[in-house]
Amino acid sequence: LSANTMAEDVTTMLAGELEFDPPADDYIGVVNVVGTIQEQTQSSVLDTSSGYQHNTTMDYIDNLMDDSDNKGILLYVDSPGGAVYESEELHDKLVEYKETTGRPIWTYMAHYAASGGYMTSVTGDKIYANKNTVTGSIGVIMSGYDMSGLYEKLGIRYVSITSGVNKDSSKLTDEQVAIYQSQVDECYQEFVNI
């Protein structure tokens, strides 16, 4: 295929509201992972102005799996990472694509392929990166704000009535910090084991 024909075919495949209209001949599907990996709303995976679209991307990969004319995936990654759930689900979907179809994935890492972007990239049979690509940075973070001082200064009193000791996490106890740390450690270990 010429570059123009391939670009037109990719545009045709991805244009419209989740419309999957692949070319009549063999083709390589392009999966864009651009921006923060989390669920957002948009109608086309070609439109990267709003960032990565999780459900749209997952549906697109399902369509590629079902299409015998598809001969592989070019995975374009330009992402600093994102949510643990969506990153791991995307990784697992790409692994499923390879295992189900036996077709290859080629990964191209652009500006960033860090954290969840790295997790996604490692599904490639071949990985290509620019010499200036920022990659790696595997890790998991959970954070929040302690606004108690501000509330006190403004005269705002927080009241919480719960059905269990660990239901309210607005004023973290040592036990709750340990629980959250255990969850972060577990997610990190899953990441390392990929």
Where are these regions (language model features)?
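Small-residue-centered hinge/linker elements
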Residues: L1-R103, Y112-I194
